[in-house]
Structure formats: structure tokens, C-alpha cells
């Protein structure tokens, strides 16, 4: 289960993301600009929905314990070049 909570309306937007899988729980502090969210979602989804999709994408590629504890969404493409291209599939999945 992925829980996304917005903790700041500033620039960039600031979130706490909690991932519960199996026995464990991880917490992540994630930032994302409004512009990045609009680009990733074609302005069709909320930032919270965008981050849920981001974490589903990441969890398909690595265990929750390997996801950075603190990061900006822009760094994901450094590790996974396919990120922006593939994210749409995760946004439209229920």
C-alpha cells in the first residue's frame, strides 16, 4: 500500500510517502515541482496520484528498502531512463 501525504504547498511541492509491503514499512520525503507533475500527467492527475504512480513504477524495479529516503522526482530518470516514457502506464492503471 502506498500512502501519499502533501506536507507543503511551497515550491517545490513537498510530500511524505509511506510504503507498506509485507512486514515492513518505509518512509520517503519526496519533492516535485508543479510543472513536473503537469508534464508527467499531461495535467490530468493530482500530484498525489502522480506520486502513487511514481512509487508503483519504482517498486516494479526495486524493493521499497532500496528507494531513496529523500529525493526529487527529477532524479528518477538518472537511475531509470525509461521513467517518463513508462509512467503513463502506471497513471492509468487502477
Language-model region placement:
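N-terminal intrinsically disordered, cationic/polar leader segments
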Residues: 1-41, 73-94
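Acidic, aromatic-enriched beta-alpha/helix-loop junctions
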Residues: 31-64
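Residue-level signal for secondary-structure boundary elements
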Residues: 62-66, 88-91
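Metal- or metallocofactor-binding catalytic centers and their adjacent structured scaffolds
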Residues: 69
Amino acid at each position: 500500500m502506498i500512502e501519499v501525504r502533501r506536507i507543503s504547498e511551497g515550491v517545490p511541492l513537498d510530500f511524505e510517502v509511506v510504503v507498506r509491503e509485507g512486514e515492513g514499512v518505509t518512509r520517503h520525503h519526496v519533492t516535485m515541482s508543479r510543472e513536473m507533475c503537469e508534464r508527467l500527467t499531461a495535467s490530468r492527475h493530482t500530484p498525489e496520484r502522480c506520486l502513487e504512480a511514481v512509487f508503483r513504477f519504482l517498486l516494479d524495479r526495486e524493493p521499497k528498502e532500496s528507494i531513496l529516503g529523500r529525493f526529487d522526482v527529477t532524479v528518477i530518470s538518472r537511475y531509470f531512463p525509461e521513467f517518463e516514457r513508462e509512467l503513463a502506464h502506471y497513471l492509468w492503471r487502477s
